[in-house]
Amino acid sequence: MPKKNDKTAGGKRDQLIDTALRLFARHGYRATGIDTILAEAGVAKMTLYHHFKSKDELIVAALRRRDADWRAWFMGRVAKRAATPRERLFAVFDVLEEWFRNQDYHGCSFGQAASEFRDPKHAVHKMASEHKQQMLGYFRELAAAAGAKDPELLAKQMDLLVEGAIIHMEVFREPEVARIADDAAQKLVDEALS
């Protein structure tokens, strides 16, 4: 699981975001009340509303932090594991398995947010969608760099494998599902690059 970005350390705002992220991951967004966040963070309600107009605004800020930290961690790990663009397509699944095996794994914050805030116009849903679009764009970049005939198609296929592995992990708690997704990706990548 990615570590908190050093640039965000300190301050009551960051303390609220850090606490909220931890509680949302464990209990969900709607089930986690403001009073619980305040008690865990050791922060007064006035301080919360000084930094955030609403719980939804806190959720969006927490997801923005999670997005930046997660993508930096994930993409950095992929880059370290693979030397070539083609190898990076498969390193995605190595890093996915690494994440699944982490003791702090609590599933996808963004999938959970989208499922709890179903209205696509809601700020929380939009933030979740933005993250998913960023990841799809990353897969598109990897596919194009590897020489895929149709980078958009390969990116969507990779995304489906990743998202499917995440859901499988959520339900069955089998980290090795990342290896199965990797096997499927091998076939798709071979076809896309031929």
Give the residues covered by each predicted segment:
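Helix-turn-helix
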Residues: 2, 15, 19-57, 61
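N-terminal intrinsically disordered/low-complexity leader segments
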Residues: 1-11, 193-194
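Short, basic, alpha-helical segments at the C-terminal edge of helix-turn-helix-like DNA-binding modules
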Residues: 64-70
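Amphipathic alpha-helical segments used for helix-helix packing
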Residues: 87-88, 102-123
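Hydrophobic alpha-helical connector segments
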Residues: 61, 75-102, 145, 151, ...
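An amphipathic alpha-helix signature
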Residues: 17, 90, 133-136, 140, ...
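Short, solvent-exposed amphipathic helices
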Residues: 73-76, 123-134, 138-141
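Hydrophobic/aromatic-rich alpha-helical bundle segments in the mid-to-C-terminal region
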Residues: 4, 124-130, 144-193
